[in-house]
Swiss-Prot record:
Mg(2+) 1 binds at residues 116, 121, 153. Keywords: Cytoplasm, Hydrolase, Magnesium, Metal-binding. The keyword Metal-binding applies. The gene is IPP1. This is Inorganic pyrophosphatase.
Length: 287
Protein backbone atom coordinates (compact mmCIF):
# COMPACT_ATOMS: atom_id res chain seq x y z
CA UNK A 1 0.00 0.00 0.00
CA UNK A 2 1.72 3.13 -1.24
CA UNK A 3 0.96 6.62 0.06
CA UNK A 4 2.29 9.95 -1.18
CA UNK A 5 1.83 13.57 -0.17
CA UNK A 6 0.16 16.18 -2.43
CA UNK A 7 1.35 19.67 -1.49
CA UNK A 8 -0.80 22.67 -2.34
CA UNK A 9 0.54 26.16 -1.72
CA UNK A 10 3.55 27.44 0.18
CA UNK A 11 4.53 26.19 3.65
CA UNK A 12 4.19 28.85 6.38
CA UNK A 13 1.06 30.34 4.78
CA UNK A 14 -2.65 30.14 5.61
CA UNK A 15 -3.39 28.44 2.27
CA UNK A 16 -0.87 25.60 2.68
CA UNK A 17 -2.40 22.11 2.54
CA UNK A 18 -0.94 18.62 2.31
CA UNK A 19 -3.34 15.91 1.16
CA UNK A 20 -2.47 12.22 1.35
CA UNK A 21 -2.83 10.10 -1.80
CA UNK A 22 -3.06 6.37 -2.31
CA UNK A 23 -1.96 5.44 -5.83
CA UNK A 24 -2.53 9.05 -6.90
CA UNK A 25 -6.05 9.32 -5.44
CA UNK A 26 -6.68 11.58 -2.42
CA UNK A 27 -7.66 9.78 0.78
CA UNK A 28 -8.34 10.90 4.33
CA UNK A 29 -5.40 10.40 6.71
CA UNK A 30 -7.95 10.36 9.55
CA UNK A 31 -10.29 7.72 8.10
CA UNK A 32 -8.94 5.95 4.99
CA UNK A 33 -5.40 4.93 5.90
CA UNK A 34 -5.50 1.64 7.85
CA UNK A 35 -4.25 1.79 11.43
CA UNK A 36 -2.39 -1.49 11.03
CA UNK A 37 0.12 -2.16 8.25
CA UNK A 38 0.18 -5.94 8.72
CA UNK A 39 -2.28 -8.69 9.64
CA UNK A 40 -0.48 -9.46 12.90
CA UNK A 41 -1.13 -5.88 14.05
CA UNK A 42 2.51 -5.49 15.08
CA UNK A 43 3.30 -2.74 12.55
CA UNK A 44 1.21 0.44 12.44
CA UNK A 45 0.86 3.31 9.99
CA UNK A 46 1.73 6.76 11.31
CA UNK A 47 1.16 10.06 9.50
CA UNK A 48 3.97 12.58 10.07
CA UNK A 49 2.48 16.04 10.68
CA UNK A 50 5.56 17.82 12.08
CA UNK A 51 9.11 16.73 11.21
CA UNK A 52 11.63 16.74 14.04
CA UNK A 53 13.38 20.09 14.76
CA UNK A 54 10.75 22.18 12.95
CA UNK A 55 8.46 24.77 14.54
CA UNK A 56 5.30 25.08 12.42
CA UNK A 57 2.34 23.62 14.32
CA UNK A 58 0.95 21.41 11.58
CA UNK A 59 -1.98 19.06 12.14
CA UNK A 60 -4.60 16.97 10.39
CA UNK A 61 -7.67 19.15 9.88
CA UNK A 62 -10.73 17.69 11.56
CA UNK A 63 -13.18 20.00 9.80
CA UNK A 64 -12.06 20.11 6.15
CA UNK A 65 -13.05 17.42 3.63
CA UNK A 66 -10.54 14.55 3.47
CA UNK A 67 -8.73 16.05 6.47
CA UNK A 68 -5.64 17.62 4.87
CA UNK A 69 -2.65 18.62 6.98
CA UNK A 70 -2.55 22.39 7.56
CA UNK A 71 -0.91 24.86 9.90
CA UNK A 72 -2.89 25.65 13.03
CA UNK A 73 -3.86 29.27 13.65
CA UNK A 74 -4.80 31.43 16.60
CA UNK A 75 -6.67 34.70 16.03
CA UNK A 76 -5.91 34.40 12.32
CA UNK A 77 -2.15 34.03 12.80
CA UNK A 78 -0.09 30.95 12.05
CA UNK A 79 1.08 29.06 15.13
CA UNK A 80 4.69 28.04 15.77
CA UNK A 81 6.06 26.07 18.69
CA UNK A 82 8.73 27.98 20.61
CA UNK A 83 12.30 26.79 21.15
CA UNK A 84 12.65 25.78 24.80
CA UNK A 85 16.36 25.49 25.59
CA UNK A 86 18.07 23.15 24.76
CA UNK A 87 15.41 21.96 22.30
CA UNK A 88 14.72 23.30 18.81
CA UNK A 89 11.12 23.00 17.63
CA UNK A 90 9.55 19.58 18.06
CA UNK A 91 11.74 17.04 19.82
CA UNK A 92 10.62 14.09 17.64
CA UNK A 93 8.91 13.33 14.36
CA UNK A 94 5.39 14.12 15.52
CA UNK A 95 2.15 12.90 14.02
CA UNK A 96 -0.93 10.76 14.42
CA UNK A 97 -2.33 7.28 14.07
CA UNK A 98 -5.10 7.00 11.45
CA UNK A 99 -8.45 5.47 12.37
CA UNK A 100 -8.11 6.50 16.04
CA UNK A 101 -9.98 9.13 18.06
CA UNK A 102 -9.56 10.39 21.62
CA UNK A 103 -13.27 10.64 22.43
CA UNK A 104 -14.12 13.91 24.25
CA UNK A 105 -17.44 12.37 25.32
CA UNK A 106 -15.62 9.82 27.51
CA UNK A 107 -13.65 10.25 30.74
CA UNK A 108 -10.70 7.86 31.00
CA UNK A 109 -10.92 5.93 34.30
CA UNK A 110 -7.22 6.34 35.16
CA UNK A 111 -6.49 9.88 33.98
CA UNK A 112 -9.91 11.16 35.17
CA UNK A 113 -10.04 13.43 32.10
CA UNK A 114 -11.87 13.42 28.77
CA UNK A 115 -10.21 12.77 25.42
CA UNK A 116 -8.89 15.73 23.43
CA UNK A 117 -11.02 15.16 20.29
CA UNK A 118 -8.01 14.34 18.08
CA UNK A 119 -6.48 11.25 16.50
CA UNK A 120 -3.90 9.64 18.80
CA UNK A 121 -0.63 11.60 18.90
CA UNK A 122 2.54 9.72 18.01
CA UNK A 123 6.22 10.49 18.69
CA UNK A 124 8.59 8.64 16.36
CA UNK A 125 12.04 8.49 17.94
CA UNK A 126 14.15 7.10 15.08
CA UNK A 127 17.19 8.78 13.56
CA UNK A 128 15.71 9.94 10.24
CA UNK A 129 13.89 13.27 10.04
CA UNK A 130 10.51 12.73 8.40
CA UNK A 131 8.55 15.01 6.06
CA UNK A 132 5.05 16.47 6.20
CA UNK A 133 2.52 13.89 5.03
CA UNK A 134 4.91 10.94 5.21
CA UNK A 135 3.24 7.64 6.13
CA UNK A 136 5.73 5.72 8.24
CA UNK A 137 5.47 2.10 9.33
CA UNK A 138 6.24 1.96 13.03
CA UNK A 139 6.19 -0.33 16.05
CA UNK A 140 4.82 0.66 19.43
CA UNK A 141 7.09 0.98 22.48
CA UNK A 142 5.10 2.83 25.16
CA UNK A 143 2.88 5.77 26.03
CA UNK A 144 2.90 8.96 28.11
CA UNK A 145 -0.34 10.45 29.46
CA UNK A 146 -0.17 14.22 29.09
CA UNK A 147 -2.91 16.23 30.77
CA UNK A 148 -3.21 19.19 28.44
CA UNK A 149 -5.50 21.95 29.72
CA UNK A 150 -7.67 19.40 31.50
CA UNK A 151 -7.86 16.86 28.67
CA UNK A 152 -6.24 13.45 28.27
CA UNK A 153 -3.67 13.71 25.48
CA UNK A 154 -1.87 10.39 25.02
CA UNK A 155 1.58 10.44 23.41
CA UNK A 156 2.42 7.05 21.89
CA UNK A 157 6.17 6.39 21.65
CA UNK A 158 7.15 4.48 18.50
CA UNK A 159 10.13 3.63 16.29
CA UNK A 160 10.23 3.43 12.49
CA UNK A 161 10.52 -0.27 11.57
CA UNK A 162 13.33 0.63 9.14
CA UNK A 163 15.43 2.39 11.80
CA UNK A 164 18.79 0.71 12.55
CA UNK A 165 17.75 0.35 16.22
CA UNK A 166 14.26 -1.02 15.52
CA UNK A 167 15.22 -4.65 16.14
CA UNK A 168 16.65 -3.76 19.57
CA UNK A 169 13.72 -1.62 20.75
CA UNK A 170 10.77 -3.84 21.69
CA UNK A 171 9.38 -2.24 24.87
CA UNK A 172 9.78 0.97 26.81
CA UNK A 173 12.69 -0.20 29.00
CA UNK A 174 14.74 -0.79 25.83
CA UNK A 175 14.50 2.93 25.03
CA UNK A 176 16.37 3.92 28.20
CA UNK A 177 18.97 1.21 27.52
CA UNK A 178 19.76 2.26 23.94
CA UNK A 179 18.69 5.92 23.98
CA UNK A 180 19.53 7.07 27.51
CA UNK A 181 17.92 10.38 28.46
CA UNK A 182 15.40 10.42 25.61
CA UNK A 183 12.31 9.70 27.73
CA UNK A 184 13.32 12.25 30.37
CA UNK A 185 13.87 14.89 27.68
CA UNK A 186 10.54 14.01 26.05
CA UNK A 187 8.73 14.42 29.37
CA UNK A 188 10.45 17.77 29.92
CA UNK A 189 9.61 19.06 26.44
CA UNK A 190 5.90 18.28 26.71
CA UNK A 191 5.85 19.75 30.22
CA UNK A 192 7.31 23.13 29.25
CA UNK A 193 6.69 23.76 25.54
CA UNK A 194 3.64 26.00 26.07
CA UNK A 195 5.18 28.14 28.82
CA UNK A 196 6.74 30.72 26.41
CA UNK A 197 3.20 31.40 25.11
CA UNK A 198 2.05 32.34 28.61
CA UNK A 199 0.38 29.03 29.42
CA UNK A 200 1.00 26.96 32.56
CA UNK A 201 3.24 23.93 32.70
CA UNK A 202 1.52 20.79 31.42
CA UNK A 203 0.89 17.95 33.84
CA UNK A 204 1.16 14.19 33.41
CA UNK A 205 -0.87 11.30 34.74
CA UNK A 206 1.05 8.43 36.38
CA UNK A 207 3.57 10.94 37.80
CA UNK A 208 5.06 11.32 34.34
CA UNK A 209 5.87 7.61 34.00
CA UNK A 210 6.01 6.27 30.46
CA UNK A 211 3.82 3.17 30.46
CA UNK A 212 4.90 0.03 28.62
CA UNK A 213 4.01 -1.40 25.22
CA UNK A 214 1.12 -3.51 26.53
CA UNK A 215 -0.55 -0.47 28.10
CA UNK A 216 0.03 1.57 24.94
CA UNK A 217 -1.61 -1.13 22.82
CA UNK A 218 -4.65 -1.05 25.11
CA UNK A 219 -4.95 2.72 24.60
CA UNK A 220 -4.63 2.29 20.84
CA UNK A 221 -7.39 -0.34 20.88
CA UNK A 222 -9.67 1.95 22.91
CA UNK A 223 -9.11 4.86 20.52
CA UNK A 224 -9.56 2.59 17.49
CA UNK A 225 -12.93 1.45 18.85
CA UNK A 226 -13.90 5.09 19.51
CA UNK A 227 -13.07 5.95 15.88
CA UNK A 228 -15.16 2.97 14.67
CA UNK A 229 -18.17 4.43 16.48
CA UNK A 230 -17.38 7.89 15.12
CA UNK A 231 -17.19 6.79 11.47
CA UNK A 232 -20.39 4.72 11.83
CA UNK A 233 -22.27 7.69 13.29
CA UNK A 234 -22.75 5.95 16.64
CA UNK A 235 -21.26 8.66 18.89
CA UNK A 236 -23.37 11.10 20.87
CA UNK A 237 -21.53 14.07 19.39
CA UNK A 238 -19.07 13.96 16.46
CA UNK A 239 -17.83 17.49 17.30
CA UNK A 240 -18.05 18.75 13.73
CA UNK A 241 -15.45 16.29 12.42
CA UNK A 242 -15.56 15.72 8.66
CA UNK A 243 -16.15 12.01 8.15
CA UNK A 244 -15.84 12.07 4.35
CA UNK A 245 -13.74 9.19 3.02
CA UNK A 246 -12.96 7.60 -0.34
CA UNK A 247 -12.44 3.93 0.59
CA UNK A 248 -14.91 2.91 3.33
CA UNK A 249 -17.84 2.02 1.09
CA UNK A 250 -19.97 0.68 3.98
CA UNK A 251 -20.08 4.10 5.69
CA UNK A 252 -22.69 6.79 5.07
CA UNK A 253 -19.95 9.36 4.47
CA UNK A 254 -18.20 7.35 1.72
CA UNK A 255 -17.73 9.62 -1.30
CA UNK A 256 -15.43 8.87 -4.22
CA UNK A 257 -16.39 12.31 -5.53
CA UNK A 258 -14.63 13.92 -2.56
CA UNK A 259 -11.29 13.08 -4.19
CA UNK A 260 -12.15 15.01 -7.35
CA UNK A 261 -12.67 18.16 -5.28
CA UNK A 262 -9.02 18.24 -4.22
CA UNK A 263 -6.97 20.77 -6.24
CA UNK A 264 -3.93 19.55 -8.21
CA UNK A 265 -0.52 19.73 -6.60
CA UNK A 266 1.12 23.17 -6.65
CA UNK A 267 4.43 22.91 -4.85
CA UNK A 268 5.72 26.34 -3.85
CA UNK A 269 8.79 27.37 -1.84
CA UNK A 270 8.22 28.01 1.85
CA UNK A 271 7.30 31.55 2.83
CA UNK A 272 9.81 33.27 5.13
CA UNK A 273 9.24 32.85 8.87
CA UNK A 274 9.43 35.75 11.29
CA UNK A 275 12.84 35.85 13.00
CA UNK A 276 11.13 35.69 16.41
CA UNK A 277 10.46 31.98 15.80
CA UNK A 278 14.23 31.35 16.11
CA UNK A 279 14.41 32.71 19.66
CA UNK A 280 15.52 30.39 22.47
CA UNK A 281 13.49 30.47 25.68
CA UNK A 282 15.20 29.63 28.98
CA UNK A 283 12.72 28.20 31.46
CA UNK A 284 13.49 28.14 35.16
CA UNK A 285 13.34 24.68 36.70
CA UNK A 286 13.05 22.92 33.35
CA UNK A 287 15.91 20.49 33.95
Amino acid sequence: MSFTARQIGAPNTLDYRVFIEQNGKPVSPFHDIPLYANEEKTVLNMIVEVPRWTNAKLEISKEEKLNPILQDTKKGKLRFVRNCFPHHGYIHNYGAFPQTWEDPNQVHPETKAKGDNDPLDVCEIGEQVGYVGQVKQVKVLGVMALLDEGETDWKIIVIDVNDPLASKLNDIEDVETHLPGLLRATNEWFRIYKIPDGKPENQFAFSGECKNKKYAEEIINECSEAWEKLIKGETADSKGISLDNTTLSSTQTFSEAAASGVPPASVQPAAPIDKSVDKWFFISGAH
